[in-house]
């Protein structure tokens, strides 16, 4: 085989090549930094899929400085027909909600993405506070003694809440937006917003928070819907619609705080 020597680049040429590569690298870093900044500036939503497989019956204070205590967390209710656990359904919808929100340009922080966790309601609120999230969505299913009870509702603190009064008004607005759009998407009965100061996961929150009770697992028809993949997707989109409406009312965009 005949070898052919290629002329080596001159010192000037090597210097020019190095400059070009350095400039290209700097441009790439600048683009990466800008994309990273845009990502950080997006509104961040914390999602807490309510309950878990392992019940934690130890007591914890329902709010900062409170003498009143409640069990840390339960496994939730169970479907009257499906016999499926609430914690399973909550997580399924929460994961769909995560995808729906990301598709709309939000950042998402998940409190849990598996059923095998040991997280009290207080801990979940603290995790959301520390995550840098802007709002907290707590996803739950409802239950009642009567099988005829049906529909969706949201929960927020009262305006006189002794633990998180500073976020009460915003939490109520968020709750109103979410329950309205969820019911519009799904056709579920709108049971409105329930105001309460007894929920640990609300009282320890420092960011606007709502508990979303998606439907009654004690109602035969609603129980089956809550485990239906298509219906779960409608719930997720409905909640995401509510988040959009909440920020539209505040004059804020998805991609920036």
Residue ranges and their predicted role:
Residues 1-257:
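Catalytic-site microenvironment of enzymes
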């Amino acid at each position: 085989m005949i070898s052919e020597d290629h002329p080596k680049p001159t010192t000037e040429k090597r210097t020019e090549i190095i400059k070009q590569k350095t400039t290209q690298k700097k441009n790439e870093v600048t683009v990466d930094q800008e994309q990273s900044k845009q990502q950080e500036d997006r509104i961040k939503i914390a999602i807490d899929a309510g309950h878990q497989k392992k019940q934690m019956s130890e007591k914890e204070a329902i709010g900062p400085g409170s003498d009143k205590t409640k069990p840390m967390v339960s496994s939730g209710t169970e479907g009257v027909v499906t016999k499926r656990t609430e914690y399973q359904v909550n997580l399924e919808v929460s994961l769909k909600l995560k995808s729906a929100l990301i598709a709309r340009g939000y950042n998402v922080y998940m409190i849990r993405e598996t059923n095998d966790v040991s997280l009290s309601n207080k801990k979940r609120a603290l995790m959301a506070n520390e995550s840098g999230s802007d709002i907290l969505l707590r996803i739950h299913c409802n239950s009642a003694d009567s099988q005829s009870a049906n529909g969706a509702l949201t929960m927020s603190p009262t305006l006189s809440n002794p633990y998180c009064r500073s976020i009460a008004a915003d939490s109520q607005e968020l709750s109103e937006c979410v329950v309205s759009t969820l019911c519009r998407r799904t056709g579920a009965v709108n049971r409105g917003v329930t105001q309460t100061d007894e929920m640990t996961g609300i009282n320890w929150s420092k960011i606007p928070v709502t508990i979303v009770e998606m439907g009654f697992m004690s109602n035969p028809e609603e129980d089956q819907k809550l485990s239906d993949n298509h219906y779960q997707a409608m719930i997720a989109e409905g909640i995401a619609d509510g988040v959009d409406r909440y920020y539209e009312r505040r004059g804020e965009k998805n991609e920036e705080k």
